[in-house]
């Protein structure tokens, strides 16, 4: 079946597409728009529905025709006419022909439409034809009247120089005719009125083929010709026919001046419209003046205006009335600002700038604020183990942590602060292990300052010793409670009663004797009463009600610091308040940076550290000093500025400490210049060891000789240290560090003496003996070979076997060996066994592989370096 589209049906019935689409949808057809297709049966139903509603549609069409009548004034007709000079042939006949042609076209179109729409309804078609004939007769009458009025108007234009009386008479006639025409047309015409269209638009709207339907015009004759707007260069002024390029002046003004005047009026109106909302914005209430003006010297009028809620112009005016000539951006001094505040009746108060570079003060303020905070929670106690050397402090801590730290310490003594955490019944206790040697007095003092409880370890078979007394003094000066642990109760010569009596001399009275000091008899070796000691520590912590606020920015204290070859500056810190996270910007002493990594005491990486937790951090720009304060800042920019300012202040202080010669110190200076000096370059593994060794060496008193530390630092001995020592005729002391290969080669070439130590008091004794000239012939170590670990195997009952390659020299089975990792000496001992291809050998030369074990040491990793040496006797020089 042939199908038709909706728009084709709409064209046949003469109805708009939208109406046909809606009608089709009402009939239940599946259509979407005017492009939808329907079959012949649906077309018949659709046309039949429109035929049934034809009378109503015709009525609507009639009303639409009336509403679309166009009102054309005589002035617009005048505009469309050409000049008599240019066109001598009048267009009246043409207009009549056009009107007749339009009427005939309309009649033909109406007949065709009636023939299509009124099929099957002859009565309705006859009535409609009769109505249209009547309408055409009325339109013809109106056209004739309009042509008559137009003719009279042209007669008026041909004789413009007649007397005024004739003009008035014609004017009266035209007005009366105009009114009659208007009265007749207004009865018929209802619709929009278009007055004074431009000639171009009127020409454009005229039909070229004279086939368009033209409605009855509405003719209006004006009382007097008025000035018309220019259009396409054909102007009419004062009702006279104009000519292009002429009659440019009207009433003494040019058209260009009129155009400029209109443009000026338009711009002025636009400016007024823009200024209206601006006036509404400025209308605002003045805010009340503040009671106090907190100002800074150097503020300008704009800054003050923001603080006191006034416009800067008002402030400038006020200052001008006070005799001060200024502008909005000019800085004002203190007196001027106070004078202005007094004029407004405001109290002026100068802002006090806080020195953010003083992190010690900032540390104290945050500590006090945390104590007053409502968000405090319980924190683990920080316990420092103190006492004399070799009284069992580290052994006790090993018992608590189930480790063996003391077995790997040089000389069996602790030479750095160690921080550890122990868990007991779901509660944590942080322990600090301090050195007991006399050289580490500052370390013990720092340990007492950052701790909550001091555990004083005293050997039951040795009693109170000098460092025991020093530890008591440190604890009392820090106002820290003391718990006495009498150790080595497993020994036959243990006498705890004697120890108690000695401690009572220092006002440490046991609870059994009516005092407030807790005494616990323990044995770190066997574990006797160690749990009782922990219970006493927790009991003391509960009494003290230790709390902290973890929601604040972190503050803490550096326990120890060192320089790692692979990681850079490393600091062991104890967090005291707040929480430290990875990425936080911090200032530590004179250094700054952002936390890169954090490692706990078990060697595990952590992302945050809470109060009372010791961690090892990296990311600082330099190695800080021990006991430096750690303060967290909001952004890295502030931390950098504070750190750089503190470094600059430290440099200035060091320069100020240089003593210049005066009359008062002239004799002392001359006496010192005559003294002999022992220049030393000091390098150690951690900052605390550097401080302890430096202070111990400077305290050596030998008449006529003194120690001069020209340089000290942490890390391995490098080329710059050797160069400095060679230029200063000094020797190098290395404590728990080794020289690099290039530094060692350069030292041999330059003849620089490098002394390496792992026990601090041996270094002190050697320097003292050298200063006194009493250095006896000693044994000197001679390195005979270097090895690199390439593989490791763990064998039960044997230990760790290190598969190594001899890089240099020779390895003997009775030689001593030193384990070096990242330039740090990890262990110094003896070779237990040496094998090659599963056979025991006495020696292995350079370029060969071998397997060896180290006596009492199994912590060997791939990449470790072995330094094999022998002790050779050196005759005194």
Curated annotation (Swiss-Prot):
Keywords: Cytoplasm, GTP-binding, Initiation factor, Nucleotide-binding, Protein biosynthesis. It comes from the Bacteria. This is Translation initiation factor IF-2. Belongs to the TRAFAC class translation factor GTPase superfamily. Classic translation factor GTPase family. IF-2 subfamily. SUPFAM superfamilies: Initiation factor IF2/eIF5b, domain 3 (SSF52156), P-loop containing nucleoside triphosphate hydrolases (SSF52540), Translation proteins (SSF50447). GO terms for cellular component: cytosol. Coiled coil: none annotated. HAMAP family: IF_2_B. Residues 78-89, 102-116, 135-155, 162-189 have a biased composition (Basic and acidic residues). The keyword Repeat does not apply. Residues 433-436 are annotated as: G3. Residues 123-132 have a biased composition (Low complexity). Its main location: cytoplasm. One of the essential components for the initiation of protein synthesis. Protects formylmethionyl-tRNA from spontaneous hydrolysis and promotes its binding to the 30S ribosomal subunits. Also involved in the hydrolysis of GTP during the formation of the 70S ribosomal complex.
């Amino acid at each position: 079946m042939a199908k038709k589209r909706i728009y084709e049906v709409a064209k046949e019935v003469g109805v708009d597409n939208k109406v046909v689409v809606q009608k089709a949808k009402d009939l239940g057809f599946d259509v979407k728009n005017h492009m939808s297709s329907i079959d012949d049966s649906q077309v018949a139903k659709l046309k039949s529905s429109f035929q049934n509603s034809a009378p109503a549609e015709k009525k609507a069409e009639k009303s639409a025709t009336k509403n679309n009548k166009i009102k054309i004034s005589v002035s617009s007709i005048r505009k469309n006419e050409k000049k008599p000079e240019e066109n001598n042939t009048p267009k009246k006949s043409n207009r009549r022909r056009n009107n007749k042609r339009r009427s005939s076209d309309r009649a033909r179109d109406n007949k065709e439409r009636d023939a299509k729409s009124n099929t099957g309804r002859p009565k309705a078609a006859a009535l409609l034809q009769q109505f249209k004939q009547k309408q055409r007769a009325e339109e013809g009458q109106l056209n004739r009247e309009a042509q008559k009025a137009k003719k009279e108007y042209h007669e008026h234009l041909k004789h413009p120089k007649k007397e005024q009386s004739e003009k008035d008479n014609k004017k009266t006639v035209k007005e009366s005719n105009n009114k009659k025409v208007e009265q007749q047309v207004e009865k018929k015409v209802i619709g929009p009125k278009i007055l004074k269209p431009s000639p171009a638009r009127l020409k454009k709207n005229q039909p070229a083929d004279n086939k368009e339907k033209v409605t009855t015009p509405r003719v209006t004759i004006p009382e007097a010709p008025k000035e018309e707007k220019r259009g396409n260069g054909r102007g009419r002024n004062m009702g006279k026919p104009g000519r292009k390029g002429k009659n440019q002046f009207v009433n003494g003004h040019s058209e260009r001046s009129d155009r400029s005047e209109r443009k000026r009026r338009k711009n002025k109106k636009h400016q007024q419209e823009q200024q209206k909302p601006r006036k509404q914005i400025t209308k605002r209430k003045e805010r009340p003046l503040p009671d106090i003006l907190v100002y800074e010297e150097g503020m300008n009028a704009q800054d003050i205006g923001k603080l006191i809620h006034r416009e800067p112009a008002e402030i400038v005016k006020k200052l001008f009335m006070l005799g001060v000539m200024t502008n909005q951006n000019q800085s004002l001094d203190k007196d001027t600002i106070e004078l202005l505040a007094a004029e407004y009746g405001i109290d002026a108060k100068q802002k006090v700038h806080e020195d953010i570079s003083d992190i010690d003060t900032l540390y104290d303020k945050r500590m006090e604020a945390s104590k007053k905070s409502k968000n405090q929670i319980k924190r683990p106690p920080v316990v420092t183990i103190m006492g004399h050397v070799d009284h069992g402090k580290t052994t006790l801590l090993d018992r608590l942590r189930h480790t063996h730290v003391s077995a790997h310490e040089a000389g069996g003594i602790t030479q750095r602060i160690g921080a550890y955490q122990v868990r007991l019944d779901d509660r944590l206790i942080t322990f600090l292990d301090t050195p007991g040697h006399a050289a580490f007095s500052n370390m013990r003092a720092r340990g007492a300052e950052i701790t909550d409880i001091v555990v004083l370890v005293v050997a039951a078979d040795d009693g109170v010793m000098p460092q025991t007394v020093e530890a008591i003094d440190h604890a009392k000066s820090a106002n820290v409670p003391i718990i006495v642990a009498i150790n080595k109760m497993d020994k036959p010569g243990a006498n705890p009663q004697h120890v108690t009596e000695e401690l009572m001399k220092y006002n440490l009275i046991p609870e059994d004797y009516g005092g407030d000091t807790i005494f616990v008899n323990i044995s770190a070796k066997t574990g006797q009463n160690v749990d009782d000691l922990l219970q006493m520590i927790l009991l003391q912590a509960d009494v003290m009600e230790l709390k902290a606020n973890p929601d604040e920015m972190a503050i803490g204290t550096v326990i120890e610091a060192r320089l790692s070859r692979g990681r850079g500056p490393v600091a062991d810190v104890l967090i005291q308040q707040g929480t430290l996270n990875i990425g936080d910007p911090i200032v530590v002493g004179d250094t700054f940076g952002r936390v890169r990594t954090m490692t706990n005491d078990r060697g595990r990486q952590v992302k945050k550290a809470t109060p009372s937790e010791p961690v090892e951090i990296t990311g600082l720009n330099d190695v800080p000093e021990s006991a430096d304060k750690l303060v967290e800042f909001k952004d890295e920019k502030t931390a950098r500025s504070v750190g750089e300012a503190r470094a600059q202040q430290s440099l200035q202080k060091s320069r100020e400490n240089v003593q210049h010669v005066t009359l008062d110190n002239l004799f002392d200076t001359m006496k010192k210049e005559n003294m002999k000096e022992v220049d030393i370059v000091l390098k150690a593994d951690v900052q605390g060891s550097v401080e302890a060794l430096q202070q111990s060496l400077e305290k050596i008193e030998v008449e006529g000789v003194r120690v001069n530390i020209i340089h000290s630092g942490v890390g391995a001995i490098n080329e710059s240290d050797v160069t400095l020592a060679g230029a200063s005729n000094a020797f190098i002391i290395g404590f728990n560090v080794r020289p690099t290969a290039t530094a060692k080669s350069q030292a041999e070439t330059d003849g620089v003496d490098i002394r390496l130590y792992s026990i601090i008091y041996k270094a002190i004794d050697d320097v003292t003996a050298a200063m006194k000239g009493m250095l006896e012939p000693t044994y000197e170590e001679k390195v005979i070979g270097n090895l690199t670990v390439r593989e490791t195997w763990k064998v039960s009952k044997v230990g760790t076997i290190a598969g190594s390659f001899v890089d240099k020299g020779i390895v003997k089975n009775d030689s001593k060996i030193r384990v070096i990792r990242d330039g740090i000496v990890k262990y110094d001992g003896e070779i237990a066994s040496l094998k090659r291809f599963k056979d025991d050998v006495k020696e292995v030369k350079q370029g060969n592989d071998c397997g060896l074990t180290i006596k009492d040491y199994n912590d060997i990793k791939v990449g470790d370096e072995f330094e094999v040496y022998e002790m050779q006797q050196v005759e005194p020089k």
